[in-house]
Amino acid sequence: MFFSRNSFVNHKKISYICSVNSKLKPWRRTREFTLFIMYRIFISHSWSYSSDYDKIESFLRQEGIAFYNHSVPKNDPIHTNGTDKQLSDAIEAKVKGCSCVIILAGVYATYSKWINKEIEMAKKYSKPIIAVQPWGAEHTSNVVKNAADVIVGWNAKSVANAVRNYAINQSL
């Protein structure tokens, strides 16, 4: 994931007031600081459905969410040359360090051999699970819906609001 100035355009502003010098006049005693929230997000995905994965990333950027992508990248050699154990360990390390897990609640999720493991890992480390219902999907995965802390629709605003409301506050 790359970071640019544009990542911080629509940041969440939090103001803190602190005492600078008690001898100053009251209106000069305070200073306001703005913090930028950076989320660590694991987006569960099947590389067969990588366009949905890309769309989730674009939803987050579109809504001004500054985030570090904790997902295991497609070009990681573990995907092609590694064992299931190595991939499982890589996913667990990524989930352990994230603020929240986003899972597409499409029917394919029910048949993915990794979804249950990712859900189990998220629960093990008390990571909130955000389920996103794919646009126009008639059927969704009960496995994902039952594990989710929140289920949102297929649009940028609802995905971004879920991240803001459910992600665990962590610093990079």
Question: How should these model regions be labeled?
Answer:
Residues 125-132:
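A short helix->loop->beta-strand "cap" motif at the edges of active sites that frequently abuts
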Residues 107-124:
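Conserved TIR/SEFIR loop-to-helix hotspot centered on a Trp-containing motif
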Residues 136-151:
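Glycine-rich, charge-decorated loop segments at or immediately adjacent to ligand/cofactor-binding or catalytic sites
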Residues 160-172:
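A charged, well-structured terminal subsegment
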Residues 16-17, 23:
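Short, positively charged and aromatic/hydrophobic N-terminal segments
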Residues 24-97, 172:
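Conserved N-terminal substructure of TIR/SEFIR domains
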